[in-house]
Amino acid sequence: MAKIIGIDLGTTNSVVAVMEGGEPKVIPNEEGGRTTPSVVGFTKTGERLVGQVAKRQAITNPENTIFSIKRFMGRRYNEVNEEMKMVPYKVQQAGDHVAVLAQGKEYSPAEISAYILQKLKKAAEDYLGETVTEAVITVPAYFNDAQRQATKDAGKIAGLDVKRIINEPTAAALAYGLDKKKDETIAVYDFGGGTFDISILEVGEGVIEVKSTNGDTHLGGDNIDQRIVEWLIDEFKKKEGLDLRAKGNEMALQRLRDGAERAKIELSTTMETEINLPFITADASGPKHLVERLTRSKLEEMVRDLVDRSIEPCRQALKDAGIDASKIDEVVLVGGQTRMPRIQQVVKEFFGREPHRGVNPDEVVAIGAAIQGGVLKGEVKDLLLLDVTPLTLSIETLGGVATPMIPRNTTIPTKKTETFSTAADNQNSVEIHVLQGERPMAGQNRTLGKFHLTGLPPAPRGVPQIEVTFDIDANGILNVTAKDNATGKDQKITITSSSGLSKEEVERMAKEADAHAAEDKAKKEEIEARNQLDGMVYQIEKMLKENGDKISPSERGDVENALADSKKALETNDAKQMNAARERLTAASHKLAEAMYKQAAPGAGAPGAGPGPEAAGGAQQAQAEPKKDEGVIDAEYVDVDEKK
């Protein structure tokens, strides 16, 4: 039975896991790493790089290396002003939504994410030895409908049937609570690369119930890196009078980002670090080097407001759950950024207890996703997950008011029906405007979709009975139906286009991704064929130079012709042609190999020993001689006896 893999599609890193023998297991990628950088690079030659190899070339190719794409998933162009300032690649408008530009081609955020998912899918297939088509993918708890839908689209483009979208803190709680027998109330504090989430859950006896969730999708480790980058730029400007923000310094900025991230990581375990970036730029006086010392206390001072920003959502989540911080039994830290001592201290101060450090903050979410995959497959028994919708869902009513249908933190899946009426006499249609958010007015919330219910019979205002139903599935994705009770007419909308991609676009991108996977395979085959043929040409040329006089002129001509054909094949990009040339070269070089073998055979180099029968006779004679000379043998026996 095919497995359902669990994927943590992260802002900075991604992880894939699977249930094996009743236990969740993290699957290493092709390079052997348990985490895969969420980075996609596009080279000048048209090659697409994903993961560590893409991250390594980011400094020399910053404008075509896409990272932190999760921050753009399902977002409108007018929502990403701050995010755009933090990346060196071009982010542009595509309708209402966002696209990134690399090597002159436009990509949607879902497409870029799909390339990361494809790499994880392949790692799982290599590990399991079978095709993988189903996955559970995690998202930040505070992701809205559009962001969730974009994640599902990315899965589809990557060739995955996304069986469930689950919230990251909930996945972490699944991993934490798998073996818990007693009931506990836990808080999952998830500070990742691009988003922050807090969830309050009740865990125990096979039930994991989310009581409330809150967060900030504009707060993450990237923001902390950016603060260090800004500080480095300002310090460098003070000393050298050069502004590294100026156009043309893209490579320098990418080096600063790398240096900032390294320094931040080092300061989690040391009190001081040096950021040393030689030849960061140059002016008329020559090259300039950046060397700065950064202390842990200075970093904490720089990012104090960012860390403190995470506390208000915690306060709100506790309020929504109706419990006090003192009633929390355990605080589970998730996300690489929680390794920062200042964050651990703030969490300890707010919740009044030491945070739990028994889980790997980088891997726990993917492990939880794999467990959920096991639940869906029936591999994990007696485990019930009750998640919630993070944001209030409303419809617009008279006066531009947002009338709530499903309040935030409602357990999902759920269904809610309300009856509305018309606002004017003889109104023959109504517009259903679906909203997501916590603000009282429709215009202050996010539009998920609009549709019309038409063909209403003429009637005074307030008379028609229009039944509106909101239905949220287990993925947190919404269906809305409006029905006129008088005529029985109804109209339905599935909020699926909110990611900015139509069904046709998703299918087209999926086909392109498949084609690209085939291209990648062909490229790999070409490289392997080239390497094998190139190595063989080198060997045969060397053999011919050293032993060419030991074969006949016609045989030598065959080898030389095969070598010439092989060199021509190496100039092509055709793996079949190169493999065929290698086979011809192998066949032609057999005589040369035989000549070398004969030369290397024992006794072949003795004087007078030629390839003819005389040599064979000589060998027989040599073997017979010791038998004639018994004295030699006797003498040996005497010698041995004397030694004894």
From Swiss-Prot:
Belongs to the heat shock protein 70 family. Coiled coil: none annotated. Induction: By stress conditions e.g. heat shock. This is Chaperone protein DnaK. Keywords: ATP-binding, Chaperone, Nucleotide-binding, Phosphoprotein, Stress response. Acts as a chaperone. Residues 612-624 have a biased composition (Low complexity). GO terms for molecular function: ATP binding; ATP-dependent protein folding chaperone; unfolded protein binding. Residues 632-644 have a biased composition (Acidic residues). The keyword Chaperone applies. Residues 598-644 are annotated as: Disordered. The modification Phosphothreonine is found at residue 195. Pfam families: HSP70 (PF00012). SUPFAM superfamilies: Actin-like ATPase domain, Heat shock protein 70kD (HSP70), C-terminal subdomain, Heat shock protein 70kD (HSP70), peptide-binding domain. The keyword ATP-binding applies. InterPro entries: ATPase_NBD, Chaperone_DnaK, Heat_shock_70_CS, HSP70_C_sf, HSP70_peptide-bd_sf, Hsp_70_fam. It comes from Koribacter versatilis (strain Ellin345).
